Design a protein with these regions (language model features):
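Core segments of cupin and vicinal oxygen chelate
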Residues: 1-54, 99-102, 140-170
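A cross-kingdom feature marking solvent-exposed beta-strand/loop segments within repeated
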Residues: 30-36, 42-45, 66-71, 75, ...
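Extracellular structured ligand-interaction cores
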Residues: 48, 55, 70-72, 135
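Short, ordered coil/turn segments that flank beta-strands lining enzyme active or ligand-binding pockets
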Residues: 54-56, 109
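Conserved beta-strand in the GNAT
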Residues: 57-62, 115
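Vicinal oxygen chelate
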Residues: 86-146, 150-191
């Protein structure tokens, strides 16, 4: 996990927003300025690291896999699309978890979740930075590219083919020969 975080910060120029975790039973977060050696000495146990650059927000978490897997894809939606996407999830009887009005997760039953955000001021600020960096393509290695693409496309009402979904200006492509369940990060194209 530390190597993945280091790649985003060192090679791709992302900024560390915060590392969230625990010291003993106490939940805590550390912003940039605390190195891993400092955190290790404090007994810090990482839950997730949040990174940001331009209009891209990446959250990395420790996992049991050698290569990164994707738990969820996050989307900022306008109010109408947010409501319509939740309605489509309800029709499909998918599990929806709302977290205090800040974000909503939808389990897709296709090995990944969607994190949906209705309009928010902080999101507008993040998206306004798209001239600095935005995600043009995301390739995910998957066990069933067709299922994953159709699930994402249908839930978001986005155009899709057998392995590719066009979400706004971003292409999400599911490539074959991936692990069962959660897709594996295969490639990203930032512009």
């Amino acid at each position: 996990m530390r190597e993945v975080e280091a790649r985003y910060i060192g090679k791709l120029g992302f900024t560390l927003v915060a590392r969230h975790g625990r010291i003993g039973e106490e939940t805590t977060a550390f912003e940039a300025g605390y190195g891993w050696d400092d955190l290790d000495r404090m007994g810090f146990k990482l839950r997730l690291s949040e990174l940001e650059r331009g209009a891209v927000n990446v959250v990395v978490q420790p996992g049991q896999w050698e290569l990164p897997r994707v738990d969820h894809l996050g989307f900022a939606l306008d109010e109408d699309d947010f409501v319509a996407t939740l309605a489509r999830a309800e029709v499909r009887e998918l599990r929806v978890q709302e977290h205090g009005g800040r974000r909503t997760f939808v389990s897709t039953n296709a090995g990944f979740r969607l994190e949906l955000h209705p309009p928010r001021d902080w999101l507008d600020d993040l998206l306004a930075s798209s001239s600095e960096l935005q995600l043009a393509e995301l390739h995910l290695r998957a066990d069933d590219p067709e299922l994953k693409a159709s699930t994402l496309g249908e839930l978001l009402a986005a155009p899709y083919t057998e392995d590719t979904v066009m979400v706004g200006e971003t292409i999400v492509r599911f490539v074959p020969d991936g692990p069962q369940g959660r897709p594996q990060l295969h490639a990203e194209l930032f512009v």
